[in-house]
């Protein structure tokens, strides 16, 4: 899990995704490829560059970032190893209540194209929420979009864990840390 704390790893994984293609296949071209900001439309107090941060499709750039982290395919199987030699395999559990399966499959393929292995598994919504609540997900797989009026009337979207039980809560440990006053 340490690798997820590295901004270059997260950026590499982001720019390895072809959001335009994913929009066409998974959302019938109806979406707007962007980074999640929590707001739509973006309010004046939010920096517009947040919507496009690390959203360009750049597999060569992703490969360069991963190379720079010392993640290399040392055994020739097409999958990168971590600097300590361990394989990195991302478990992509998802529920179709939160995201379409083909979207998850596309993400897995884009990441495979830059040497990151993953296992895609559909689970029930209850299994997903249980794993999410207990911080057992490698990657949060959930589509997200909220109109500004809902965001402004719902502080759950602005405070860790950034949602309620029925949404995509992606900061459970941070919320626990805040609730415990840092202990």
List the model feature ranges, each with a label.
Residues 1-28, 32-33, 37, 42-183:
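Extracytoplasmic/periplasmic ligand-capture domains
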């Amino acid at each position: 899990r340490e690798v997820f704390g590295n901004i270059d790893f997260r950026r590499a994984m982001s720019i390895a995704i072809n959001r335009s293609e994913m929009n066409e296949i998974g959302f019938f071209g109806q979406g707007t490829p962007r980074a999640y900001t929590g707001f739509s439309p973006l309010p004046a107090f939010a920096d517009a560059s947040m919507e496009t941060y690390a959203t360009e499709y750049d597999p060569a750039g992703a490969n360069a970032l991963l190379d720079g982290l010392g993640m290399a395919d040392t055994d020739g199987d097409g999958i990168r190893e971590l600097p300590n030699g361990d394989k990195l395999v991302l478990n992509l559990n998802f529920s179709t209540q939160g995201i379409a399966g083909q979207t998850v499959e596309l993400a897995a393929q884009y990441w495979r194209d830059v040497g990151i292995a993953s296992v895609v598994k559909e689970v029930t919504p209850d299994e997903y929420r249980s794993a999410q609540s207990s911080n057992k997900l490698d990657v949060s797989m959930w589509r997200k979009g909220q109109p500004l009026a809902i965001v402004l009337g719902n502080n759950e979207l602005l405070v860790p864990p950034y949602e309620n039980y029925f949404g995509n809560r992606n900061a459970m440990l941070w919320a626990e840390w805040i609730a415990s006053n840092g202990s």
